[in-house]
């Protein structure tokens, strides 16, 4: 599977502050789900950004995704990250959410991750990791365990 690597990373500490799910309490994960629910209730949809449309390799079942966010007791365990990103001078709260559907990408069973902008319900981008990926290269120095989720 090919990996997309952007030269314009948002992971720089000057552009983004973020909290990884391993640093969150269960209550914080539930708060992230509540923020997603509030976003869907307010905007009535989740919409793919033009950037996301160039990255997506499968069809998203939006009714299944939204149903999972609202009805599944497992939704908090699909929260991967909460972040606040400086996007052209505006602060955007974003959640990375693991889709409940396993997809096959380039012959590899994969999890799909969605970066959802809480300000407008836009799915900013998506990426895929094989289901056996253990994230050995994850650098928690980029994360802030003290970030308040709100």
Cite the ranges covered by each PLM segment.
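Ribonuclease/tRNase effector modules and their secretory precursors
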Residues: 1-150
